[in-house]
Structures are given as C-alpha cells and as structure tokens.
Amino acid sequence: MLNLTSETISELCDVYGNAFYLLDSKKFNNNFVELSNEFKKIYPNFNIAYSYKTNYTPKLCKIVNDNGGYAEVVSEMELEIALRIGVEATKIIWNGPIKNQDKIKQLLLMGGTVNIDSVFEMVNNESKKITENENV
C-alpha cells in the first residue's frame, strides 16, 4: 500500500499538475484476487467482468486480464483496448445500448459475448447469419 504524505502529494503536483490519477496497482491486484477467491468459495464457476467504462486505464485492465478476469466493454474504443492488452475474445463481453453492427459481428466471430437487451436488437439478426459459431 502507498504511504502518502502531504510532501509526496506536493511533489507529485509539481510533476503532474493538480489533476492526476494515483493508482496503487498492487492494492488493486490484491483486492481483485481476494474478491475473486472469496466468491469462488461459494460459486466455483464465478468470474469477474471488469467494467472498462468505469476506468479503462490499460494498467488496471491488464491486471484484471492477468488474473483471469473478463472485459466488459460498451464502446469500440474499450474493445480495442481489451484486444490491445491481450484479452482473449472469449473473455470479452459487449454490453450497453449502442452497438456497432460490424464490431458485434467481429466480436461474435472471434468467440466473444454480446449482451442482448431485447429480442429485437440487431444482434439477433446478425447472429442468425453466423453459422460457423454454434454458441451464438
């Protein structure tokens, strides 16, 4: 855990300005592992899908991926971040109300998951066209 003093914060402000993120990646990692392990005691098939919308800082997203977590994305940018840091498509879940039809098709063909908000959503029509993947 970080030991912050007012002097340390002042030094950081001198370097980065008054607005910056300070992340404790070790603490984030430990919290992720602890949460996952506790749930797996009760639900052995439990997985965490980390919301990139909440904080898509690649370092944090990579920690989630390195610990077996899933990427929950809501935009093309978040999808690209997930793929760029090495998340397997099978561990990407596209959620949210706005979905690019071409990106959905790409993710489905790669083995990813798309949450469907209604039976009328465009994903339903697209998935019917994809015959190579029986899990759609």
Regions found by a protein language model. Give the residues of each.
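A charged N-terminal "starter" segment
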Residues: M1-T113, V119-N135
